[in-house]
Structure formats: structure tokens, C-alpha cells
């Protein structure tokens, strides 16, 4: 039953980018999973090119013990003729981190459960998502796709009525945000990592504006729910609660982070705004200002399919 759904499961943000980057730089990679080998093959066959990208694939049924035992990782290193001490493991689970460390390898944790980073302290590094990976820290070729402090992402599009948020944007931060009802976008948000993004915002009766947006739990305020908080980089004379807001999210700036003070949080938000302002003038991002999705009233629900909206350009 589960195998029928694997084709609907998208890769984690940044996974395709990382795999292709390592392949193009001739860095051997392997899949080492607690799943059976047949299940691994079925899963990766749903992602174009993945089978050809990996030098080795090891399932739990091919070794004596699965994770947290090191057997899977040691077998993967053996098949690649690699010294375990020269291997870098990227893991999203605690048993996987334990297995990698037990194998004598370097381990980066990318927790799959929100707000669980403290549990992964045994890893050599903890990152919010694969978008935040810096390969050069581990002696690997660096990415060359960052543009003016930003990273292009496959555009995605959401829209809905502007609602009142926590009241912190204007009153506490001096930064008015145009909040959207996150519960309407649970499926979309589950596909995208928390962090600071940017793009274009269309207001049904006003026009199209540059925007920077946070998605996540806001560690400084310790939110209990994942939120979407766009900041339209324009001065408005009045509120626009209830107006239809459409967003084209086209780039990524950084992971969400905690800050030692309110002042440092505000300073960083303004810096994010300046980065977004400059980046959106670049042709790679500026072209999305003309997306029909930003100008046409929403027709079916509150969420647009990113690929379909992009094809309309």
C-alpha cells in the first residue's frame, strides 16, 4: 500500500541540488537506509536520475544489524572503497546519527521533526535543511549557485485573505507583516523548510510589490504553530485585512534562527529586507513579477500549483 504512494512523496528541499552537485564534481555517494533494498530501489526510482547518481545502495536486509549499528554505513564505505574516517553522513534520524558516529564517520544532522535540534547534539553539525549545507566546510566542492546572498528555488505560489497575526509585526518589531492563514497551506508548508524567503506579492486592488517572508516557528517568540509572515517592502497608509494576497516565492535567504535580543532580531529582519530588495532587481527573479498568478483573482482554492503557475509566464 505504501509503495503506491512513494511516487507522490517529494524529495526534501535541496536534495536534488546536492545530489547533482556531488555527481557533477565526481564525489562518490551512497544510500544507506534501514529500509529493505527492494523498498529503497522503489523509492529512488520515483526520482529521475537518482539510481544512476549513487555509487552504492545498502539496505538493512543486506547487513547483520540496522541502525543504530554502524553496519550499514561501514558496508557502504566498503563498496565505495572509502575509508570511513573520510566519509560524511547526512542523517535526519537519531539512530542514523548514532550509526554514523559509531562507524567513525563525520555526521551532519538534518532533523525531520520540527524543534528537535537539541536531541542531535552528538552530530558534528546540525542544519535546518539541505539548503543550508556548506560542502566546503567538509572539504567538498562548494556550491556555485548563490546569487547576491540568495539561492534560487523552484517557484511556488500561494494566496488567500490577509488575516491578523500575533500583533507583533507593527507593535513590537515595527515591521508590519501581511499574514496568511497557515492552516490553509498545511500540505504546501510541509514540503518547504522553515526559513526566510523572498519574492513578489500581489494585492488584488493595489498592485505588485517586493516581499520578504518568514516561514516557521519563530524561535525568538517560540511559536507553537508554523506561520507564514510576509513583509511587503512598501509603505502603506492603511491596513488591508481581508484583501486577497497572492505570493510568488522565488528565492531563499537563510534558515530561521534565534536571536540574543529583540534589537538583533529587528536588525536581521531589515537586513533580509535589503537583500530581497536588491535580489529582486536581478533578471533571475525580476521575471516573476509578471506572473499572471499575481494579477488574476484566485479561481480554485487558496493554493496554486507552482509548476502550473510558472508555465504561465
Language model: regions and residue ranges:
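Short clusters of hydrophobic/aromatic residues that line enzyme substrate/ligand-binding pockets
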Residues: 9, 63, 180
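Hydrophobic beta-strand core positions in alpha/beta domains
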Residues: 30-31, 109
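Phosphate/ribose-recognition catalytic cores of enzymes acting on nucleotide-derived substrates
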Residues: 154-313
Amino acid at each position: 500500500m505504501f509503495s503506491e504512494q512513494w511516487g507522490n512523496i517529494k524529495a526534501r528541499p535541496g536534495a536534488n541540488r546536492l545530489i547533482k552537485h556531488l555527481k557533477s564534481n565526481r564525489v562518490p555517494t551512497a544510500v544507506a537506509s534501514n529500509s529493505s533494498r527492494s523498498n529503497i530501489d522503489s523509492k529512488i526510482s520515483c526520482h529521475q536520475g537518482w539510481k544512476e547518481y549513487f555509487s552504492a545502495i545498502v539496505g538493512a536486509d543486506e547487513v547483520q544489524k540496522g541502525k543504530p549499528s554502524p553496519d550499514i554505513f561501514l558496508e557502504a564505505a566498503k563498496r565505495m572503497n572509502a575509508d570511513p574516517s573520510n566519509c560524511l553522513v547526512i542523517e535526519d534520524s537519531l539512530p542514523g546519527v548514532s550509526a554514523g558516529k559509531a562507524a567513525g564517520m563525520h555526521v551532519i544532522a538534518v532533523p525531520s521533526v520540527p524543534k528537535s535540534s537539541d536531541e542531535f547534539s552528538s552530530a558534528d553539525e546540525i542544519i535546518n535543511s539541505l539548503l543550508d549545507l556548506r560542502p566546503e566546510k567538509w572539504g567538498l566542492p562548494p556550491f556555485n549557485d548563490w546569487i547576491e546572498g540568495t539561492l534560487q528555488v523552484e517557484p511556488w505560489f500561494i494566496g488567500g485573505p490577509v488575516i491578523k497575526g500575533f500583533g507583533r509585526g507593527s507593535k513590537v518589531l515595527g515591521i508590519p507583516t501581511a499574514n496568511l492563514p497557515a492552516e490553509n497551506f498545511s500540505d504546501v508548508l510541509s514540503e518547504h523548510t522553515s526559513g526566510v524567503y523572498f519574492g513578489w506579492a500581489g494585492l488584488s486592488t493595489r498592485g505588485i510589490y517586493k516581499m520578504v517572508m518568514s516561514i516557521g516557528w519563530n524561535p525568538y517568540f517560540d511559536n507553537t504553530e508554523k506561520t507564514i509572515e510576509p513583509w511587503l517592502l512598501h509603505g502603506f497608509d492603511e491596513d488591508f485585512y481581508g484583501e486577497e494576497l497572492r505570493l510568488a516565492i522565488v528565492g531563499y535567504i537563510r534558515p530561521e534562527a534565534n536571536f540574543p535580543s529583540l534589537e538583533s532580531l529587528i536588525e536581521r529582519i531589515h537586513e533580509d529586507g535589503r537583500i530581497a530588495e536588491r535580489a529582486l532587481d536581478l533578471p533571475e527573479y525580476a521575471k516573476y513579477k509578471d506572473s499572471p498568478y499575481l494579477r488574476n483573482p484566485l479561481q480554485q482554492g487558496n493554493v496554486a500549483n507552482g509548476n502550473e503557475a510558472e508555465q504561465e509566464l
